[in-house]
Amino acid sequence: MRKVKLAALQFSCTQEAKENIAKADQMAREAAAQGAQVILLPELFERPYFCQERKYGYYHYAKPVMENEAVLHFRELAKELQLVIPVSFYEREGILLFNSVAMIDAGEVLGVYRKTHIPDDHYYQEKFYFTPGNTGFKVWDTRYGKIGVGICWDQWFPETARCMALMGAELLLYPTAIGSEPILDCDSMPHWRRTMQGHAAANIVPVAAANRIGLEEVFPDEENGGQRSSLLFYGSSFITDE
């Protein structure tokens, strides 16, 4: 049986992309020093979760995969330390915008997965920013095994995990940005974990999720229609095999 060491990182995200990339770099190096070979980062970790509000100005965050700062940075880190790192980023492909992950294997970008399931409610307004993915589910044959990656809301749908398992995935990873549910007034964390434990048990494959942490607030202005809101991202990143 193949033995692989996996690290799931969680941290709060500031307004400065360079700060968030540097923080993720430091944590990834610390994990690698402890033997981690696969590093999982949270969803859209370059910035605060901008999908909490609607602003056209945020569209400029989207870049082609080989122009994204985080992808380029972690491509070099993965090459230096011989790591596998799926990097979540806001992707521009022509006139289309996607919530994507670039799978990096020791410096090589093996390909991109684009988020299939796009949430849309009062505080997770992703359909304003992202087109549903057109890649289909993907599994990559990396130096540390066959790895499939879903993105956040993908994890709620059993088809995501099952499709990747049927494609031969030995490990399923979910970069995530999930927190409080002000409209429902409930704690979704236990349900979130149990759902993915079910995916692991049903497909007989380890599953990991990396989530951000911290309170992120939106303040009213003309462009967001006077919205005032906040989300408390609860972290609770985990690795499970059942």
Label the predicted regions.
Residues 1-6, 139-148, 171:
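Beta-strand-turn-beta hairpins that frame and shape the catalytic cleft
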Residues 112-114, 174:
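Residue-level detector of high-confidence beta-strand sites
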Residues 66-84, 152-242:
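CN hydrolase (nitrilase-like) catalytic-core segments centered on the catalytic cysteine
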Residues 6, 103-110, 231, 235-242:
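Short, glycine-anchored, charge-dense loop/turn motifs used at functional sites
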Residues 115-129:
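A short, polar/charged loop-to-alpha-helix boundary motif
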Residues 6, 20, 28-57, 78, ...:
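Active-site beta-strand/loop signature of hydrolases that rely on acidic residues for catalysis
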Residues 87-89, 100-103, 138, 237-239:
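Short beta-strand scaffold segments in enzyme catalytic cores
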Residues 54-67:
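A charged helix-plus-loop insertion that forms the helical arch/lid used to bind
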